[in-house]
Amino acid sequence: MTATPKPLVLIILDGFGHSESHEGNAILAAKMPVMDRLYKTMPNGLISGSGMDVGLPDGQMGNSEVGHMNLGAGRVVYQDFTRVTKAIRDGEFFENPTICAAVDKAVSAGKAVHIMGLLSDGGVHSHQDHLVAMAELAVRRGADKIYLHAFLDGRDTPPRSAKKSLELMDETFARLGKGRIATIIGRYFAMDRDNRWDRVSTAYNLIVDSSAEFHAATGVAGLEAAYARDENDEFVKATRIGEPANVEDGDAVVFMNFRADRARELTRVFVEDDFKDFERARQPKVNYVMLTQYAASIPAPSAFAAGSLKNVLGEYLADNGKTQLRIAETEKYAHVTFFFSGGREEPFPGEERILIPSPKVATYDLQPEMSAPEVTDKIVDAIEHQRYDVIIVNYANGDMVGHSGIMEAAIKAVEYLDVCVGRITDALEKVGGEALITADHGNVEQMTDDATGQAHTAHTSEPVPFVYVGKRQLKVREGGVLADVAPTMLQLLGMEKPQEMTGHSILVEE
């Protein structure tokens, strides 16, 4: 194995995409002398961090979880959204043994099928097309009583956009000749992830016992009444639609969210016999199915089992005796550890982790530097003492300040990043180390919505930069994706990539 400079640093600038448009582009509006110099003097190009290139449906913007999973895996990791969509298209979904078993059991006992989930086209936690497919499956399996418990979005979709989704489900049930919307409630209640059990209990009691502050003849009528009360989709209060459709013993309950974090709490209320976070009036004995595995500790089957990733970058470095540091502030710590390691919580042998607390402010536009200076102090110290073969760092600023929609703060955020990158590259030059600079997805390069003129707070589908910083004569090939970053790092370290990594190095000899 050839001797390699020490260390190799992967700098992930979260939410730092590339756009030629100056409109609302915090990166082009900022003074970034370090990045400007690197773009002029170092091999660089653009790589893709969205859509099929990261295992998402075509055109779907990337996100931090997906981005880090692809960066660390060295292969395109097909996301749950894509797996479910593909299964529906192929017809496999309608034969899914876990869902079919639960539905068949309910049907043979003359019981109901309850479908619940986030009803929107946001594609972040769920997709309405999946709920349509579930209704079709229930009808195909002979169910007569099919009830939809719709959680309304307004967070990954515009604040008042649920009407078309409710109409889609009404049309679906009319076409199928069976089924109806039974309840509507905002995701604020049904999809909490911070142990706010008062909210979750409101959703649970609505679904199980039709216990509701409001009721309406149709889903759309219930929504319009909520708007009249000045409630946006996310905050729509518990509303029963039509006659009560309570959950009874022997019913099937299928939760159609594919993302786990906001589906765990409500699921636990349904399935845990020793649940103690609030007093349940009733716990019906149901055939419960999670669309994906929300947590290994939850005693319920999942329709799509979690896949495990072998020989991700962290594991392969450890197996080859290399040391590594993972470092980020709180907001992105899970991404640079758990997600970058392919969904593994524990560190690999020779892996150290540093968590820098994120600042305690209401929103990060109030402190756009976040904890980047403290993160950088630790990295510079680690480089100077040459403690690790590889350092992997995430800077949260571009994404977290980008989500605020406030342009001035976003400009300050990326200017702080430029200073931090300068400190790291200066330290590396002194010890003969190297760096790769990239991002997981875009955000801060688009702070205004061209269509509406309003603040743009979401991620983008723009490509992200890729920069090599070091002494080697290399150039960046075109067509790279996030999955190519780990193989590139192994090339720089003089290591063969494992066969599980299907990505290819982005750097080629000049």
Swiss-Prot record:
Changes seen on gene knockout: Cannot use, as a sole carbon and/or energy source, a wide variety of hexoses and intermediates of hexose catabolism.
The keyword rRNA processing belongs to this UniProt entry's keyword annotation: no
One GO cellular component term noted in the UniProt record for this chain: cytosol
Binding of Mn(2+) 2, residues: 14, 64, 440-441
Keywords, alphabetical: Glycolysis, Isomerase, Manganese, Metal-binding
InterPro entries, A to Z: Alkaline_phosphatase_core_sf (IPR017850), BPG-indep_PGM_N (IPR011258), Metalloenzyme (IPR006124), PGAM_B_sf (IPR036646), Pgm_bpd_ind (IPR005995)
Pathway per the UniProt entry: Carbohydrate degradation; glycolysis; pyruvate from D-glyceraldehyde 3-phosphate: step 3/5
Membrane-spanning residues: none
GO molecular function ontology, one term from the record: manganese ion binding
Record SUPFAM superfamilies: 2,3-Bisphosphoglycerate-independent phosphoglycerate mutase, substrate-binding domain, Alkaline phosphatase-like
Cofactor binding note of this UniProt entry: Binds 2 manganese ions per subunit.
Entry annotation: catalytic residues: 64 (phosphoserine intermediate)
Entry's EC annotation: 5.4.2.12
Any GO BP annotation: glucose catabolic process
Entry binding sites for Mn(2+) 1: 399, 403, 459
Binding site residues for substrate: 125, 155-156, 187, 193, 259-262, 332
Record's catalysed reaction(s): (2R)-2-phosphoglycerate = (2R)-3-phosphoglycerate
Keyword flag Metal-binding: yes
The protein's assembly and partners: Monomer.
PANTHER family for the chain: 2,3-BISPHOSPHOGLYCERATE-INDEPENDENT PHOSPHOGLYCERATE MUTASE
General function of this protein: Catalyzes the interconversion of 2-phosphoglycerate and 3-phosphoglycerate. Essential for the growth and pathogenicity on the host plant.
Family per similarity comment: Belongs to the BPG-independent phosphoglycerate mutase family.
Name of protein: 2,3-bisphosphoglycerate-independent phosphoglycerate mutase
Source organism (scientific name): Pseudomonas syringae pv. tomato (strain ATCC BAA-871 / DC3000)
